[in-house]
């Protein structure tokens, strides 16, 4: 059986962030692609099925595109410069549990990615031992 590629789709306006995430995720064994908006994922459904999405978008954009994104909530990481209790609550109600404070710490990203469950036929990144817990939320410098 042919092994499917692990895709990581990156949505961020900051070119430096995109370049950094590309480099980090390629090191972790992902094929990466930068996207400008969620509509680009519509054409790539099969790749998204076996991958994950990292995005820095406003909550309003997430709510608008939620019907489309709902099926990937378990492999969606929201990156944001400001993590508040209100934001965390709104995202949890939507089914999004992975929130990372920007700038993204590569070691924390590795922990978060390690906890993602990829579908059958998609080889998950091999990072060694699996950590505890299933979801990470970074608030300030701490992981909650």
Question: Which role does the model predict for each range below?
Answer:
Residues 13, 79-83, 103:
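Conserved active-site segment of CheY-like receiver
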Residues 15-33:
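Two-component/phosphorelay signaling modules centered on CheY-like receiver
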Residues 34-52, 60:
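Acidic, metal-coordinating helix/loop segments flanking the phosphotransfer/catalytic sites
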Residues 40, 62, 82-86:
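Negatively charged, flexible loop motifs adjacent to catalytic sites
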Residues 42, 61-74:
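Short amphipathic alpha-helix used as the core "switch/output" element in two-component signaling
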Residues 80-99:
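Alpha4 helix (beta4-alpha4-beta5 surface) of REC/receiver domains from two-component response regulators
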Residues 86-87, 104-113:
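C-terminal output helix
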Residues 120-144:
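CheY-like receiver
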């Amino acid at each position: 059986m042919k092994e499917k590629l692990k895709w990581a789709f990156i949505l961020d306006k900051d070119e430096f962030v995109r370049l950094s995430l590309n480099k980090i995720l390629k090191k972790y064994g992902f094929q990466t692609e930068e996207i400008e908006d969620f509509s680009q994922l519509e054409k790539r459904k099969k790749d998204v099925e076996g991958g994950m999405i990292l995005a820095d978008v406003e909550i309003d954009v997430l709510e608008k595109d939620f019907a489309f994104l709902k099926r990937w909530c378990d492999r969606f990481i929201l990156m944001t410069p400001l993590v508040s209790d209100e934001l965390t609550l709104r995202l949890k109600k939507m089914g999004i549990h992975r929130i990372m404070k920007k700038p993204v710490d590569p070691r924390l990203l590795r922990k978060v990615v390690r906890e993602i469950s990829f579908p059958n036929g998609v080889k998950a990144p091999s990072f060694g031992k699996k950590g505890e817990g299933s979801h990470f939320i970074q608030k300030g410098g701490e992981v909650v």
